[in-house]
Structures are given as structure tokens and as C-alpha cells.
UniProtKB/Swiss-Prot annotation:
Pfam family, one: INSIG
Quaternary structure annotation from Swiss-Prot or TrEMBL: Interacts with SCAP; interaction is direct and only takes place in the presence of sterols; it prevents interaction between SCAP and the coat protein complex II (COPII). Associates with the SCAP-SREBP complex (composed of SCAP and SREBF1/SREBP1 or SREBF2/SREBP2); association is mediated via its interaction with SCAP and only takes place in the presence of sterols. Interacts with RNF139. Interacts with RNF145.
Disulphide-bonded residues: none
Subcellular location: Endoplasmic reticulum membrane
Principal subcellular localization: endoplasmic reticulum
Residue numbers marked as site, Required for the recognition of 25-hydroxycholesterol: F115
Free-text comment about domains: Binds oxysterols in a pocket within their transmembrane domains and interacts with SCAP via transmembrane domains 3 and 4. The KxHxx motif mediates association with the coatomer complex.
Name of this protein: Insulin-induced gene 2 protein
Record-listed Cysteine sulfenic acid (-SOH) modification sites: C215
One example of a Gene Ontology biological process annotation: triglyceride metabolic process
Length: 225
């Protein structure tokens, strides 16, 4: 073999770190898309429950009533759901407190069912006054957190989400960008923060479960390599 002859370089292989980062980025995008569509679906369902207050079940215009809100509301709810669902596991990792309480899909589905039930109660049950409605929904929302979360970070994020979402919603209403069909604006404000709090806890649980599944898949792939 001649001295000047050099071997042609073979195909470059990505290191395990680059491969892991790429895999995590793709999984993060997939989780965001899944959370977005879950948020859009829940927004449509919960909007239907609010519209159905004091109305017979499945009226003729039920399909039209699902999309009676402003067109941009479901996408905004989906975007917020994606942000919340991705934020919860990130906060857990940052605090070094991995959430391990009731980490299975059956628990997550029960949490979603309870959240829908809380929203259904706010739409269907008649209370004597708005204070009684607020206290009842607050107790139910905190009960949802205690049953399916019990983390300090989850409670803190839920309160922050409820406060921020309520303020943004009120600003939109005051500026005429969005309006409620209910003539009793005080009634709406009495249940809105509780619904946002419960929704934040619910989407956080979904996001945590998706993140835990991603960690399992990445761990299995790295073990195989």
C-alpha cells in the first residue's frame, strides 16, 4: 500500500448525546401536539356543557352549539393546554421532585372525568348564591388536586394558572374581544377561577404521564444501544 494513500472516512455516526437530544426534541414536539388536541377537544366539550344549562339533552341544534364560541377560543385553549402540560414535568425536574403519586393512565382518565364533572356541576346545579357556588367548586377543585396530584408545585402552578387565566379572560371581556352568553356576569366570575385551577391540574397530570412514558422509551432505547 502506498504511503500517500489514505483511507476514505466512513459514515459519521452521531454520538449518544446528539441522538438523545434529537429524540427528546421530537418527543417534546409530539407531546405538545397531543396536549394541544386534547385541550381543543376539552374546550369544545366544556363549552357544550355550559351551553346546555337548563336545556334538554341533545337538542336539534346541538352540533351547531358546540362551535358557537369565537373560533379562536379552542385553539387558544389547546395552546394553553400544551404549555401547561409541558411546564409541569419541567418544573418537577427543575425542583428535583419527580412526581410519582398515582402515575398510571387510569388515574389520569379519572382526573379528566372529575374535571368534566366539576364543569358540569357549575353548569347544571343551581345554587342559592354565587358565594355558595364559589365555595363548592373551590372545595371540589382542591379535592381533585388532593386526589390526583398532592404536589406543592402542582398546587402552586394551579393557583398561578387560575389567577393568570382569570385576569386575561376578564381583560378580553372588558375590551369587547369576548363575551359570555350568560347575563349574570357575577355568576360566571364565581366559577371561572375554580375551573381554570382544576383544568391546570388535569392538563398537568396528562403532561406528566406523557413525559413519564417518554422517559421510559428513551431509557429502553439507551439500554438497547
Amino acid at each position: 500500500m502506498a504511503e500517500g494513500e489514505t483511507k476514505s472516512p466512513g459514515p459519521k455516526k452521531c454520538g449518544p448525546y446528539i441522538s438523545s437530544v434529537t429524540s427528546q426534541s421530537v418527543n417534546l414536539m409530539i407531546r405538545g401536539v397531543v396536549l394541544f388536541f386534547i385541550g381543543v377537544f376539552l374546550a369544545l366539550v366544556l363549552n357544550l356543557l355550559q351551553i346546555q344549562r337548563n336545556v334538554t339533552l341533545f337538542p336539534p341544534d346541538v352540533i351547531a352549539s358546540i362551535f358557537s364560541s369565537a373560533w379562536w377560543v379552542p385553539p387558544c385553549c389547546g395552546t394553553a393546554s400544551a404549555v401547561i402540560g409541558l411546564l409541569y414535568p419541567c418544573i418537577d425536574r427543575h425542583l428535583g421532585e419527580p412526581h410519582k403519586f398515582k402515575r398510571e393512565w387510569s388515574s389520569v382518565m379519572r382526573c379528566v372525568a372529575v374535571f368534566v364533572g366539576i364543569n358540569h356541576a357549575s353548569a347544571k346545579v343551581d345554587f342559592d348564591n354565587n358565594i355558595q357556588l364559589s365555595l363548592t367548586l373551590a372545595a371540589l377543585s382542591i379535592g381533585l388536586w388532593w386526589t390526583f396530584d398532592r404536589s406543592r408545585s402542582g398546587f402552586g402552578l394551579g393557583v398561578g394558572i387560575a389567577f393568570l387565566a382569570t385576569v386575561v379572560t376578564q381583560l378580553l371581556v372588558y375590551n369587547g374581544v369576548y363575551q359570555y352568553t350568560s347575563p349574570d356576569f357575577l355568576y360566571v366570575r364565581s366559577w371561572l377561577p375554580c375551573i381554570f385551577f382544576a383544568g391546570g391540574i388535569t392538563m398537568g397530570n396528562i403532561g406528566r404521564q406523557l413525559a413519564m412514558y417518554e422517559c421510559k422509551v428513551i431509557a429502553e432505547k439507551s439500554h438497547q444501544e
